[in-house]
Amino acid sequence: MEKALRNFTESTHSPDPNPLTKFFTEPTASPVSRNRKLSSKDTTVTIAGAGSSTTRYRGVRRRPWGRYAAEIRDPMSKERRWLGTFDTAEQAACAYDSAARAFRGAKARTNFTYPTAVIMPEPRFSFSNKKSSPSARCPLPSLPLDSSTQNFYGAPAAQRIYNTQSIFLRDASCSSRKTTPYNNSFNGSSSSYSASKTACVSYSENENNESFFPEESSDTGLLQEVVQEFLKKNRGVPPSPPTPPPVTSHHDNSGYFSNLTIYSENMVQETKETLSSKLDRYGNFQANDDGVRAVADGGLSLGSNEWGYQEMLMYGTQLGCTCRRSWG
């Protein structure tokens, strides 16, 4: 039926009176080609006034109502893919070329010649001038990196690490300036550099617009709240009494009992001088001027210096303190 409609269209077609207008005709089939199936891939376009020059378009077929259909055979499934209907044959040919290049790439057979475009690969990491400017403001140690590493990443590794860490360490580094020693292990020498972290981080934040986190004061946070609550509770509690010093022996010359021992030795020395000066011819001595006397056999009177010293020795013995010097 389609063949009959095509023959009817050809018989009723009249030439355009305007010689500058294009008109399209189907190619006449030769006696040899009549036996084979008609191909729907090619369409002959004849331009009036241009002689006998003809143009064939692959994958374009003219409809009886004057429009042009484009289709292509899928190389994988061997099926025809419908591309659409167009007003002109050139539009249908362009649609076929696009589909052919999508299926077969550079090996596709197209109706028109297309220039081979050289596609430049985009860099893996592209840094603008604003992002690379903080390195000029903040001096960093120059590391001897390989040239292939710089070409692949587009920037030195030290700069990328610094830009990444400056986002998370902004609040911690804004209140201090540190001088960090840097050991150059490649050249065998040691050097130091001083960089202001406050200026670097603030400049990088303003230029790169990397304010991902809200700015907070340095005295905020969970730890600060815990410390404040702890201080509030301790304000109403009275201070605990100081711990007593540990009990030490006479051999230890520190603490309370060492002072007691020194005082005891001085008191024994004074007592000896007093006794030696007041011994009488009977072997008795007068301890004080208040009339209280003591016998040399060891008996002591209440209120004398000897009694106070003996009481002190007894108190020291109960606490574990021993004296090296004996009585008398």
Swiss-Prot record:
Q: Where are the transmembrane segments?
A: none
The question of whether Translocase is a record keyword is answered with no
Q: Which UniProt keywords apply?
A: Activator, Auxin signaling pathway, Cytokinin signaling pathway, DNA-binding, Ethylene signaling pathway, Nucleus, Transcription, Transcription regulation
Residues covered by region (Disordered): 1-55
Task: List the SUPFAM superfamilies hit by this protein, alphabetically.
Answer: DNA-binding domain (SSF54171)
Which GO molecular function terms does the record list? Answer: DNA-binding transcription factor activity; transcription cis-regulatory region binding
Q: Which domain of life is it from?
A: Eukaryota
Expression across tissues is: Expressed in shoot apical and floral meristems, and in organ primordia. Transient expression during shoot regeneration.
Location (main, coarse) = nucleus
* Residue ranges: DNA binding: 56-113
* Record bears the keyword Nucleotide-binding: no
Query: What do the Gene Ontology cellular component annotations say?
Result: cytosol; nucleus
Q: Quote the InterPro entries the UniProt record gives.
A: AP2/ERF_dom, AP2/ERF_dom_sf, DNA-bd_dom_sf
Chain intervals with Polar residues compositional bias: 41-55
The biological process GO terms on file are:
auxin-activated signaling pathway; cotyledon development; cytokinin-activated signaling pathway; embryonic pattern specification; ethylene-activated signaling pathway; plant organ morphogenesis; response to cytokinin; specification of plant organ axis polarity
| Miscellaneous remark of the record | 'Dornroeschen' means 'Sleeping beauty' in German.
Assembly mode: Interacts with class 3 HD-ZIP proteins such as ATHB-8, CNA, PHB, PHV, and REV.
Protein's name according to its UniProt entry:
Ethylene-responsive transcription factor ESR1
Source organism of this protein record = Arabidopsis thaliana
Q: Which gene encodes it?
A: ESR1
